Structures are given as C-alpha cells and as structure tokens.
C-alpha cells in the first residue's frame, strides 16, 4: 500500500452502496470535508441490495442532525412514517400483545425507579400493564402521534420517536447528498483485490472493465459477501446459529394501510417471527424463520395469511447466517453492516449498528 509518510488517510474507498455504503459516504463527506483528498464509493447496479422497509430507533435523529437533513425533506424522499414503539404479538401467549415504547415510562418516586415501584404495586394492588404509564405506548396503541412538546411540564414532553422508511429510497437520498458534497461514485463490479506484499494491506481493487482504484483506507460495505474483510483478508466468521437458529427470511410488500400505525409490529410464529413496517406508499412485511424447523412453503403460507393488506408482489427469499466477523477492522479494512455480521433485527437495530460503527470510526479522524 502506498501511504503518506505521516500515515494520514487521503484516499477513502467505500466498497458497496446500499444503506451502509451511502450512510458512510454521506457522513464522511460531512465530517471529513477538507480532511481527506478523495472519497470514492464503488457499486454495481447489477448487484442487488437487501433493501427492504426499515424500522429504526431514536438515535437516527442524531445521524440526520449530523448531516444537517431537514426532517420533512427526509420523510418525503424516503416515504417515511413516524414510529413510537414496537408492538410484540404472540410472544408470551397466543393473543397476547404488548408494546416496547420509546421514551420514559412513569416517573421515579423518592429515589425509587418507576418500574420497581410498578412491580411492587402490581403484586399488591393489581395495577395495569407497564405500558399504560408510557405516553409513547398509549399514543401508539390509539394510532396517534405528536412531536414532543418543548415544555417539560407537558405530558407530551415524554414522547420519543423514530422512523420507518424505504431502505432503497434512503440509500438513493444519501447518494445524492454525498455526491453533491464531492463523493465520487464509480459504477463497476470488483473482480480483483490487490494486497501489498509487505504489509498485507489492501492497496487497490480492480474492476471488471480493467480500472484500478487505489486507497489508503477501505470500508467494506459489500453485504453478506464481505468481499474485502472476509474474502480478501480471510477474517473468520463467528457463527451464532447455535444460539439464534433463524437463517431464512421472506419479504413481500403489501398495500399501504388506510390508518398508518405509528409502530412496528413483530408477530411471533412457530419457528420465527413476522415484521410489519408501515410506509407512506406501501407496507413492508417479512417472515424470519429457522429452516431446521419450518420449510419454505409453510413460512410463505404464514406470511401471506397474516398480511393486513393485499400483496403488491411475490415473496422474495433471503438467506443469512447469524454471527459476526472475528474482527471488524483488519489492517486497512473496516467492515460496516452485513459485511461485518448479522443479527435478526427484532429490535430494529440494523441501521443503528451501522450508525454506531460510522460514529466510532469517524471519531478517530
């Protein structure tokens, strides 16, 4: 690898687009403006991305604020909706539902945490569910939404929210943002990775058309392929499937509901669970399941039988392996998103894990 004598990072190369790649590109363009010579992102239109409807958690606000993105512009571009909570259905008993809300639940009393007080009273007084004391959960249950009130005395000041949005549209939105700020997009399929003979660092990547893209630091956003960290550098994979056996998913869009719910729905099935993510223009649905305990046909039957609105297409199958690379940073390659690992997004944390990785990396510059 050719690198300046002071070891400064001048050429940053991002391999792969999608949500992870364009989040990295947009954040780097914003934070490293003037600090690096060139930011290049390589992607191929011939290689698809996993992109489905995405649900997030509240720290996504921090990422948008970092980029200086206006909320309404973001929602319009991504067909986004508001999210106050996750509703879990059938996870305890069949027919049982409960909310995992964002924000505060109740109020601490005389140094006693509210959930401890609630637990004590429940055993003695028969008080209602914990979610009854969360403004976010009560609003979500009633299909209502409001932005938090700035007045701390208002009950609405306890509202905390995140978003649902179309992942493909989100990547396109961030792509335009990044390119406007100087990121160079290169269209092409990577067919070769050149390693430095002495250090073992990645010195360049070769494209199908013969072009060679050199760099000082490479960000692997190539998805499950893990083209640089896994394939080129040989970093091993810690398989977690003995703990988390789900290894398949089916995804299908359906029509938008007349009443857009301000929450993500997670519905437990016999060998997995089903998500429902409401967007402006459609509803994202999917069934994550363990193929050792359920076959494809049964998984698809359950998914389609539990759609709330008519399907807009065919089921798309996905295969995955739960786990993480032994190292997410090896030599001059850092992996983000699926290139580094995968955990089924039961708590809507996929994008948050990307965001956290980006923040930790950029803090080192």
Q: What role is predicted for each listed range?
A:
Residues 6-18:
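Beta1/beta-strand and adjacent pyrophosphate-binding region of the FAD-binding site
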Residues 21:
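N-terminal Rossmann-fold NAD(P) dinucleotide-binding loop
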Residues 24-37, 63, 181:
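A short, Lys/Arg-enriched amphipathic alpha-helix followed by its capping loop at the start of a domain
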Residues 29-52:
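Glycine-rich FAD pyrophosphate-binding loop
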Residues 48-140:
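Dinucleotide-binding Rossmann-like beta1-alpha1 core, especially the glycine-rich loop
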Residues 98-192:
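Conserved N-terminal helical subregion
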Residues 152-303, 358:
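Predominantly flavin-linked oxidoreductase catalytic cores and closely associated redox partners
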Residues 280, 289-365:
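FAD/FMN-dependent oxidoreductases across multiple families
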């Amino acid at each position: 690898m050719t690198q300046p004598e002071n070891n400064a990072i001048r050429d940053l190369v991002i391999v792969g687009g999608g949500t992870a790649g364009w989040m990295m590109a947009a954040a780097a363009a914003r934070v490293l403006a003037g600090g690096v010579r060139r930011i290049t992102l390589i992607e191929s239109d011939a290689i698809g991305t996993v992109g489905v409807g995405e649900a997030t958690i509240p720290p996504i606000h921090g990422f948008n604020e970092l980029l200086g993105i206006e909320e309404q512009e973001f929602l319009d571009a991504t067909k986004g909706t508001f999210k106050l909570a996750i509703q879990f259905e059938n996870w305890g008993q069949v027919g049982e539902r409960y909310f995992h809300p964002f924000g505060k639940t109740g109020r601490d009393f005389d140094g006693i945490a509210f959930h401890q007080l609630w637990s004590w009273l429940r055993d003695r007084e028969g008080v209602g569910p914990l979610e009854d004391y969360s403004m976010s959960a009560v609003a979500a249950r009633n299909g209502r939404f409001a932005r938090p009130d700035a007045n701390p005395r208002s009950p609405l000041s306890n509202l905390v929210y995140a978003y649902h949005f179309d992942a493909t549209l989100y990547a396109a939105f961030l792509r335009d943002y990044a390119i406007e700020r100087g990121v160079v997009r290169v269209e092409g399929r990577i067919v070769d990775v050149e390693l430095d003979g002495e250090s073992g660092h990645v010195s360049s990547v070769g494209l199908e058309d013969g072009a060679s893209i050199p760099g000082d630091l490479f960000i692997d956003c190539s998805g499950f392929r893990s083209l640089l960290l896994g394939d080129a550098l040989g970093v091993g994979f810690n398989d977690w499937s003995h703990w988390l056996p789900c290894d398949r998913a089916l995804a299908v869009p359906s029509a938008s509901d007349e009443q857009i719910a301000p929450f993500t729905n997670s519905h437990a099935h016999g060998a997995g669970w089903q998500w429902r993510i409401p967007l402006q223009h459609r509803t994202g649905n999917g069934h994550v399941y363990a193929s050792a305990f359920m076959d494809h046909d049964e998984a698809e039957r359950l998914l389609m039988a539990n759609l709330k609105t008519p399907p807009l297409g065919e089921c798309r199958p996905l295969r995955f392996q739960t786990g993480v690379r032994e190292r997410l940073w090896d030599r001059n390659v850092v992996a983000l998103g699926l290139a580094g690992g995968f955990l089924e997004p039961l708590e809507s944390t996929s994008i948050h894990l990307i965001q956290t990785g980006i923040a930790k990396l950029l803090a080192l510059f």
